[in-house]
Amino acid sequence: MGLRETLCVSMLVAASPASAAEDFIKGVYLQTQELCAQAKKDTLQTLIDTGNVILSADGLQSVEYNCEFVQVTKATRSPSWAVTAICQEPGFLFPDILSITQMNATQIDIVSVRPTADEGEQAGNGGSYYLCEGVSLP
């Protein structure tokens, strides 16, 4: 392999978010523990169909809304990640930058730079999410 090919491969490996994401979000998270109980009782798809937002390592997902996590960078001094996301809803596609923090073994908090429409409204993609043990993505 020539110098040019070696350099290209090295750049791709260095840019890969795999090492930053190896301890990233594990499992499925919902916005309340009650929703987790409902997902176990019914199905996760039922909750998605009613408009609830699901958090996983892939991103945020709902019936007509999703944010794909395209770049994940691990913080060195806290259990946090800086995440670049591409979000879409019917008729709109937009970027977002998120800070995601593992608050404890079952809670993740997200802060979004996306502005809100009204004061007091939840900030963009931000909020708390709770681990739903025993629940898998459909």
Task: Give the residues covered by each predicted segment.
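N-terminal signal peptide c-region/cleavage motif recognized by signal peptidases
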Residues: 15-17
